Amino acid sequence: MTDVDPHATRRDLVPNIPAELLEAGFDNVEEIGRGGFGVVYRCVQPSLDRAVAVKVLSTDLDRDNLERFLREQRAMGRLSGHPHIVTVLQVGVLAGGRPFIVMPYHAKNSLETLIRRHGPLDWRETLSIGVKLAGALEAAHRVGTLHRDVKPGNILLTDYGEPQLTDFGIARIAGGFETATGVIAGSPAFTAPEVLEGASPTPASDVYSLGATLFCVLTGHAAYERRSGERVIAQFLRITSQPIPDLRKQGLPADVAAAIERAMARHPADRPATAADVGEELRDVQRRNGVSVDEMPLPVELGVERRRSPEAHAAHRHTGGGTPTVPTPPTPATKYRPSVPTGSLVTRSRLTDILRAGGRRRLILIHAPSGFGKSTLAAQWREELSRDGAAVAWLTIDNDDNNEVWFLSHLLESIRRVRPTLAESLGHVLEEHGDDAGRYVLTSLIDEIHENDDRIAVVIDDWHRVSDSRTQAALGFLLDNGCHHLQLIVTSWSRAGLPVGRLRIGDELAEIDSAALRFDTDEAAALLNDAGGLRLPRADVQALTTSTDGWAAALRLAALSLRGGGDATQLLRGLSGASDVIHEFLSENVLDTLEPELREFLLVASVTERTCGGLASALAGITNGRAMLEEAEHRGLFLQRTEDDPNWFRFHQMFADFLHRRLERGGSHRVAELHRRASAWFAENGYLHEAVDHALAAGDPARAVDLVEQDETNLPEQSKMTTLLAIVQKLPTSMVVSRARLQLAIAWANILLQRPAPATGALNRFETALGRAELPEATQADLRAEADVLRAVAEVFADRVERVDDLLAEAMSRPDTLPPRVPGTAGNTAALAAICRFEFAEVYPLLDWAAPYQEMMGPFGTVYAQCLRGMAARNRLDIVAALQNFRTAFEVGTAVGAHSHAARLAGSLLAELLYETGDLAGAGRLMDESYLLGSEGGAVDYLAARYVIGARVKAAQGDHEGAADRLSTGGDTAVQLGLPRLAARINNERIRLGIALPAAVAADLLAPRTIPRDNGIATMTAELDEDSAVRLLSAGDSADRDQACQRAGALAAAIDGTRRPLAALQAQILHIETLAATGRESDARNELAPVATKCAELGLSRLLVDAGLA
């Protein structure tokens, strides 16, 4: 990173400052750094025996400035407890009049130093730093202090790698950069444009500086770094006039770049309103990208008494004239021991092995929703640790622990129960000093445990019951500052209220979540049969494990039901959240413990199989659905993010069943209304499948049919034909057959899937429905033009082109009056017909004409167009262009989905050319994937590549059985779809691979034939049969081989090499094969030489290998 603070270092400080520091009570004064605003010394404060950093400002201040400086630093002293603001230990003025600030000594130096030495940080670390610094700035702004100089050099790093902001307000006090408009307080590269232009600094300018700092952390340099030899004023002009460099070009997620761009917006009004808003935006980016979401510590309202529970408030008293204390209420002994028996538990060695591997990490966190066996596992681990000689305390959390003093008192009591002599006096300190004693008590506890050199573990059970921020901070302090003599084992519904991120970075966290806690089949058998006294066969145990998803509570409830005489078969069939025993458990232990607002939200959110913020808001009639979902997730309410998209959430199936049952109590009308809301939201957001499901669930099939018929996403254009047909299957048949548009959509899907019979049926029903529909004549004409395009597609897929031009004429004569898919498909269909007529040069203008309409379609039209360009180029022996076209088609198809219909379709043609150019491995991978399409997709050329070249690849790889299977399936497809040209390709390949043909088929192939020249498809079919005849004859006696050579020569001579270059080359190679077979070696060599040269130039190495000529 280049120098981000170009201000010249001031070196005019008087040399007696060390002496003045000694006079002020500091020892061992050592200069450790200089900056634009002063000199920093490392000193020792003998009175407290600690190392500190003392910054002495380089400017003498008048009375007003001095008072303002002291006032601002005292204000910051009120925030010294903020985890991301450097603590101000002392401020004052030296004998020589220079102000100084005393801070903790940071051995790890600054963020600027870290970047200089190790380079920029990745975007995940940068987001984390940004959230924390935003909280620090917000805290300062709330007490009326601006920073004025946020930059990497003013962000120090703690021993744990945490960022802390320092030097608040010093830039204003110590002077700055002078411009024509006055003095600029701060470093230019990180200063907001409006401040550079002379405006006063505001919280918005601090927001800009924070954004500029994050830009630097990501890139290793300032956005407007001062260039070599550049004058400061020129740098100012760039900052105030030029946009920031685009971070997306560095491969960063778009939302990361956008968040920083908003913070660095040119105009203050375009930036987030507050630093807290910046932090929340960065937290949202973390959530969207599936990374850990950092907390943004903000202070409670200063000067306002902390809210307490009524009981705590009543107990609040003053002792003497000093600090308020909160007496600890009477506590039952059961709070300090496990509530689960350990003798009859299922031994979960799989999990205790994980805990054992965690060693002495400071925190072992066991988190999952209710009923997953967290406390049971913690109790088992407590027993194991005790056997190993550790002292293990137990503390069960309850509502009383939402008071910091009470929690600390309970914590001390739990420890004294296993180590009576430990921390004997600390309880009295709490009683006497209350809230003010927390930090002292925790520090003393840590020191005493360390000095005793004794291993102590504390199980804190049900931590999720704590919501008080001071109690959470107390445990966080214990975890952050503890030593390896003390280990905390925490069970909770979630990670909330714990410094998980910091501990993970320091490798001080071992974690077991709900996925690990789920019982496997062996553990379930031990629970049900061994511990539960049942005798269930393994198949039933496995079925129960699957139906409960390994949820311990459900398995135990199932065991209780079976021991009570329940029917095992009935239980296995119907165990769900609607079961009485599970319903009762979830009611008592989960739902009924929630506040009414959250309980109601969970009920309505459960209507859909999955949900997100917008959907949940629509269902509940609120604006903060996302926040409510995250609250439910944090509280472990059986809600988790989906694996494929962290913006979506899904309830545990049993909890969803339970919520559905509770929701139904409100009546069917309410449930129907929620389904209608869900359908509307899904439709508006492009989720047709779910929109239809919920319209049907709402009892509104007419709306469901309307949604499919009016679908603007047009699923076939998205290569989602089977999805469309599956949706249609859900609709009432009587409604479907009467909708002309819907029948047309069904025809589209079936034709593209190479299903001629269902497609024809849909087109027939379309005509009937259109005749009965009361539609304007113009609309009917448009629909009929679209239907004719579909019929043309069906014709070319059936390997017929005679009627294609007539069927396309209407659509191609008025393309702009029709939906884009109609002319887009018409152009592709006309191009395919041109290929079948060997009019390769005509293909490109047709596709160029269709391209604007295809750009307005889904990707399927583009995939087909690129494939057709590739087919024309390959036939013309433009192999480079063909490869490029096929690759483009494959990439577009893969963007739809790696296993999409479009990707597999393009993959078959790309694989064919890869094989011909010698890439056997690449061809094999693509062919295997394409083969999964079967007969559903493409015209004969696609099917031939899939089956014929697919078989040839298998044979080349030594899998002759696989090759035979491919050809057998291809032969069946040719018969089923009535495709003589495909059948001819299959027969030809069987001969090539030495697979015997039926005698009658061989006899037909050997018979003399005249090759027609007026029909391209008939020509290609006859040429294939003639090629097959030549190969059959070449395998016979010498007379047959002579005849084969004559017929091969005639075949090659009849093909116009100018019009059909690829076909002519293939025919030449066949003729050379027969020359060699008849012993005419000299003739074969003479003909082979130019052919081999051409193949080498084109890269078609496999043509000669397969012919045995290479």
UniProtKB/Swiss-Prot annotation:
Annotated spans, Disordered: 308-343
SMART domains given in the database record: S_TKc
Keywords attached to this entry: ATP-binding, Kinase, Magnesium, Metal-binding, Nucleotide-binding, Serine/threonine-protein kinase, Transferase
GO molecular function: ATP binding; metal ion binding; protein serine kinase activity; protein serine/threonine kinase activity
EC number: 2.7.11.1
Positions of the Protein kinase domain: 26-283
Family as reported in the entry's similarity comment: Belongs to the protein kinase superfamily. Ser/Thr protein kinase family.
Name of this protein: Serine/threonine-protein kinase PknK
Organism: Mycobacterium bovis (strain ATCC BAA-935 / AF2122/97)
